[in-house]
Structures are given as C-alpha cells and as structure tokens.
C-alpha cells in the first residue's frame, strides 16, 4: 500500500483535490437541469427516476455521487495517460499561456453568446431563450463554471482525449518513442465529436426533438468549441482548457444578462 501511495502520489493528490469540486459540480448541474429541461420531457424523465429513487433528494445525492466517482476515475487515469503522452504540465497558471488563453476565450464567449440571436431566431419556439434564461440562475452560473469548465474538461480532454491519443499511438505508431502530433490532433477531433454527441440527451430535453438545425447547433456549439479546448490542453495543459471553458460561459452569460 505504501509503495502504491508513493508511486502514484502525484495523480492521487491531483484527483483528491478535484473531488470537492466534483461533488459541488454534480449537485449544481442537476439543479440546473431541473430548471432547464422542457417540462413535458422532464416530467417523464423525473417520473421514471423518482419511481426508482423515491425522491428528488435521493436523485441529487445519486447524481452527486456519480459525478464524484467519474471524477475519481477520470482524474487518476487521465493524469497517468497525460503523463505518458507528455501532456501533463504542472498544475499552475503562467503568464504567457494565461494571456493567450484569455485572448482566445474572450472572443469565444462572444461567439457562444450569439446563439441567442442566431439559432434563437432561426429555430421555432423559445427553447434557446429558455435555455439562456435558465443559465442565468445561480444554478446555471455555478454549474457552467464548475461542471462545464472543470468536470467536462476533466472527462473529455484529460481522460477521453488522452485515452484516444494513447490508443492511437500504441496501435498505429508503437515504434515511435513519443506520440506523433497528428495522433493527438486526431484524438482532439474525435473527443470533440463525442463531446458534442454527449450533449444530445440534453438537447432533446431542451428542444423536445432532434431536427437537422438542432443537430447542427449541438455539434457546432459543443464540437467546435471543444476543438479549441483540446488544442489548449495539448499546447499548455489541462488547466488552460478548464479556464477557457469557464471563461466562455462567464462571458456569454454576462452578455445575455446585459443585452438579452
């Protein structure tokens, strides 16, 4: 046991530091979803869940615990994979990468906010406006920063993108001592597509259905921005992907608060 703790001290410390954030993020995102989803869809979903769990409090507890478990697994193994790939950097912010990340993230937040005035106009109904309004609640702000900014980057970039890159390296370029850049880029693209696909259930919850324009919105907003987060992870470290994702949400929500 002592040997294990000594050998894996760094990934264990990293993972343990994230668990309180994971607990808060898991609780907040469920609170946010309860305010966000289309009432008819939510009623059916909740009815099925509550029939199994018994109460909203249990639903919140289970959802929170689930996020903590995912964070523990993805944090620990993601750290190890990132180390093998040469992508794990000291978990601190440095001036030049920080400024470059902010220079990218502030315009991204502006672009993301345009969803309200583009797809919000082009798509029938008021689902986009309702989603934006729900995001301006306390639950929406906090879950966007902690779950979107930290947890989603932990799951999708540190773990999934690293796993895909590691598999691509070992399966197709095993003779290379270091993973080729093209493998990591391909892993970023695939992880971004899977990140967007992972938002399809939430998209159905918001819009009640999937149409071609709704699918375009889902993959453009999530997959497109996911590529940027993945590049920041590859260039500077996972903390900059987390920061960029969080800043995107903060900027877009500030714009909606002032102008929408």
Q: What kind of region is each of these model predictions?
A:
Residues 139-260:
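Transmembrane helix-loop-helix hairpins at the membrane interface
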Residues 59-71, 214-221:
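Alpha-helical transmembrane segments of polytopic membrane proteins
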Residues 2-20, 60-64, 92-107, 239-243:
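Alpha-helical transmembrane segments and their helix-start/interface "positive-inside/aromatic belt" motifs
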Residues 68-86, 155-172:
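Transmembrane alpha-helical segments in integral membrane proteins
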Residues 33-61, 69-99:
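Membrane-helix interface linkers and caps
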């Amino acid at each position: 046991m002592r040997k294990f703790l000594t050998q894996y001290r760094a990934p264990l410390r990293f993972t343990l530091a994230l668990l309180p954030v994971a607990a808060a993020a898991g609780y907040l995102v469920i609170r946010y979803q309860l305010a966000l989803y289309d009432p008819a869809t939510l009623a059916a979903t909740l009815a099925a869940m509550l029939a199994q769990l018994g109460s909203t409090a249990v639903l919140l507890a289970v959802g929170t615990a689930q996020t903590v478990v995912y964070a523990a697994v993805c944090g620990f193994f993601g750290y190890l994979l990132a180390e093998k790939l040469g992508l794990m950097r000291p978990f601190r912010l440095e001036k030049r990468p920080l400024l470059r990340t902010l220079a990218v993230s502030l315009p991204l937040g502006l672009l993301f906010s345009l969803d309200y005035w583009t797809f919000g106009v082009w798509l029938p109904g008021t689902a986009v406006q309702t989603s934006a309004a729900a995001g301006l609640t306390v639950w929406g702000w906090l879950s966007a920063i902690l779950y979107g900014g930290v947890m989603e980057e932990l799951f999708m970039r540190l773990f999934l993108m690293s796993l895909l890159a590691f598999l691509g390296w070992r399966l197709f370029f095993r003779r290379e001592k270091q993973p080729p850049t093209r493998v990591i880029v391909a892993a970023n693209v695939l992880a971004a597509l899977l990140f967007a696909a992972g938002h399809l259930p939430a998209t159905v919850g918001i819009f009640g259905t999937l149409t071609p324009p709704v699918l375009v919105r889902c993959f453009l907003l999530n997959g497109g921005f996911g590529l940027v987060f993945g590049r920041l992870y590859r260039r500077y470290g996972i903390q900059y992907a987390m920061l960029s994702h969080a800043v995107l949400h903060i900027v877009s929500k500030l714009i909606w608060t002032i102008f929408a």
